[in-house]
Regions:
Chain A
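Phosphate/nucleotide-donor binding subsite
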Residues: 60-100
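Glycine-rich phosphate/nucleotide-binding loop
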Residues: 117-141, 145, 224-228, 232-334
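A glycine-rich phosphate/pyrophosphate-binding beta-strand-loop-alpha-helix module
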Residues: 29-30, 36, 42, 48-49, ...
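N-terminal phosphate-binding or glycine-rich loops at protein starts, especially the Walker A/P-loop
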Residues: 2-54
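Short glycine-rich anion-binding loops that position phosphate/pyrophosphate groups of nucleotides
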Residues: 23-24, 68-69, 108-111, 118, ...
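Glycine-rich phosphate/diphosphate-binding loop of Rossmann-like nucleotide-binding domains
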Residues: 30, 47-53, 60, 152-217, ...
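Short, glycine-rich nucleotide/cofactor-binding loops
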Residues: 17-29, 80, 150-160, 300-307
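Short glycine/serine/threonine-rich phosphate/pyrophosphate-binding segments
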Residues: 27-32, 85-98, 102-116, 127-131, ...
Length: 334, 334
């Protein structure tokens, strides 16, 4: 399935726009186009991809036309094969064909992965690409959680590759040298967890990576490590649990502050002090997750992405492309 | 390993005290003894278990003396076999021997499970006991998460039993008839997840249980179901992730409110409105998790349990014992 990839020189990528799936996400196309416009205004070249009649006003941005759209409900594996002229598949082709330096989509995650994998190909020796999702760490660089949901079933060898790729990504994106790696388990002891975790623990000790040891669910938001490695099932459950808990508390706080004039005034007093934390925890400010292990840069943004989230994702996509993240990731597993 | 169990008549249990491991937990023995004293003051018979010289002042409560203590760091499997005169093992024996209606410990979770399993035995047909942990649901009954950490590796047949036992427990503890069952996965579709999840999904459809379908991590605190079924690895990661996220936000809020006099005043204004939520989310108010599938009632309290948490755990233990929860759970899997 994976084709041989030859990486483009970074200097060549610098001249290319970021391809943006105009039809992906709950607020597409309006929020996507607005976010792309803001990125363009900040000096980043972008090109939209989508059916002209559905995208509507492009706000002056270039549009690569196509005829199909993969919806959130479409079966990922099937849709990327049958909808070959969809905005997702065409965006991935622009990266493959050297017409874009990176792609960004807030659409169907499985189909985004499938399009990127089929069109950009897998890096040599990569068993499976994974999702590296940034988890905010107030006052520090985000923690990279990998795999955040691409592979429900994993082998120890896959998890070791996730660790290598996520470490390279952490260095490329956040400048962290020798990132500390944690393995998600249900206790700090090497003897705790599933056979998958125990075997991966042993293998990680031999990699030469900066392996910290096991970490637990409670460490996600207060992490002693820079990278958390896990299978895509556990990673996805943990990430959504964390997001759900944060959203829940924010909702409670919003309700309480909105109770009456007195509580509103109290909320206004606290707001300037809370804002730095809210900003740090805001998924829209984080810039999306990256697919690790492909022959090009693909950024997956939240389905609920706002224009701001898309602008950030575009910016991150370009930085990773011209920063040579793909070469770094390729080198990490050779 | 499991012995045949014969359940005691509920009327007999009503006359028995709750056995409390005086040496279990980060704040043992002082918080444990104080919590037991408060339960006794509320009219619940309790008996402490522990080495007299370590327990110290029992505040007038009866003490079953023993000579050993299993620490948090002790290997669970080994310690329950070698430390036969430990407070944990002796507490489980009191239940087995009809001298206590239930046991409560905030100590080493693995050793608590081991002691209870070895001494009380497994209910007939139970493949594996599991931990049923209550997750607070503000404004409603708590959601029972099973397995919250007893079995890192599970089969579909085990998960189906967890669903049955947790449903019986949910009815016994919270009075919910025909509890709605959710299966923790990474998407609502039956086709999402690991082979374990997919096969369990199929089996749950045939059980006659009130099976809702798959739920996701984000549903833990905002749940459409009364019971969430998962393997003990995923359940433990999800529970700790949720607790970590809540603790993190509470910490941020506390810091912000403590900034200066103005923010303290604002905090005082919001406090009465926040308290109901904080109370609902307070693990100390929840009363601990129950081991499901044993021949007696064993309540596992948080390692960080306060006196209040222990009082609640004792109260829950007694209620479950005299409410016939063990018979209900036994009946659920026959």
């Amino acid at each position: 399935m994976a084709r041989a990839v030859s990486l483009r020189p970074v200097g060549e990528l610098e001249l290319l726009p970021v391809a943006v799936d105009a039809m992906g996400g709950d607020h597409a196309p309006s929020a996507i186009v607005a976010g792309a416009r803001a990125a363009a205004d900040a000096g980043i070249a972008v090109v939209l991809v989508g059916p002209p009649e559905l995208v509507g006003d492009t706000l002056g941005l270039p549009l690569v036309p196509c005829t199909e759209v993969i919806s959130m409900d479409d079966d990922p594996a099937q849709s990327v094969r049958t909808k070959k002229d969809s905005s997702l598949v065409r965006a991935a082709e622009l990266v493959r064909d050297g017409q874009a330096c990176a792609m960004v989509s807030a659409g169907n995650t499985g189909a985004t992965m499938g399009s990127a994998l089929l069109r950009m190909g897998r890096l040599p020796s990569v068993l499976r690409p994974c999702i590296g999702a940034p988890i905010p760490r107030p006052g520090g660089t985000p923690v990279v959680l990998a795999d955040a949901g691409a592979n429900a079933e994993c082998t120890p060898q896959m998890l070791v590759q996730f660790a290598r790729m996520a470490a390279a990504y952490c260095t490329a994106r956040y400048g962290v040298e020798q990132p500390k790696i944690g393995l998600l388990s249900i206790g700090e002891e090497a003897t705790k967890g599933t056979p998958l975790v125990k075997e991966t623990h042993e293998l990680l000790l031999e990699t030469g990576l900066n392996f910290f040891g096991n970490v637990e669910g409670r460490d996600l938001l207060n992490s002693p490590v820079d990278v958390i490695v896990t299978d895509g099932f556990t990673g996805n459950v943990a990430l959504k649990t964390m997001e759900g808990a944060l959203k829940f508390v924010m909702g409670v706080l919003g309700d309480v502050i909105g109770t009456d004039d007195e509580t509103k005034a109290a909320g206004m007093t606290l707001l300037p002090h809370l804002l730095p934390f809210v900003g740090d925890l805001d998924p829209d400010a984080i810039g999306g997750a990256m697919l690790l292990g492909l022959g090009g840069v693909c950024i997956i943004s939240h389905g609920s992405s706002s224009a701001k989230a898309i602008t950030n994702a575009i910016s991150v996509g370009r930085e990773l492309a011209i920063g040579g993240s793909t070469s770094r990731i390729a080198a990490s597993i050779l």
